[in-house]
Amino acid sequence: MSALVYFSSSSENTHRFMQRLGLPATRIPLNERERIRVDEPYILVVPSYGGGGMAGAVPRQVIRFLNDEHNRARIRGVIASGNRNFGDAWGCAGDVIAQKCGVPWLYRFELMGTQRDIDNVRKGVNEFWQQLSRSA
């Protein structure tokens, strides 16, 4: 299986989800001066910001990470978290990234996710990488 890369704000909701998921993952640093480079294909797990609109939905740290062409070339899919209070725009960072990077939006979950979300993502990530490797 290939990598997961994620960002979590200081609320740690996405981080807690990733810990419960229990799959190998790399965290995009909170400190915008710290940078990481990913050398293998990955699925990005990202929270949505901004109270429900598309403007400001993608965290700055994620934008900076994806503006590195090396990292952007390796993204294969996106999973988004958000808050259902945002209505139709909950998890919209996933939509923004999927459109801009030309990758599928694979799943969305609320806040730190439920056990059902954990099970769905584990299964879905495994199936996604298997399908991708068969089509390569």
From Swiss-Prot:
InterPro entries: Flavoprotein-like_sf, RNR_Ib_NrdI_bac, RNR_NrdI. GO terms for biological process: protein modification process. One of its GO terms (molecular function) is FMN binding. It comes from the Bacteria. Probably involved in ribonucleotide reductase function. Belongs to the NrdI family. This is Protein NrdI.
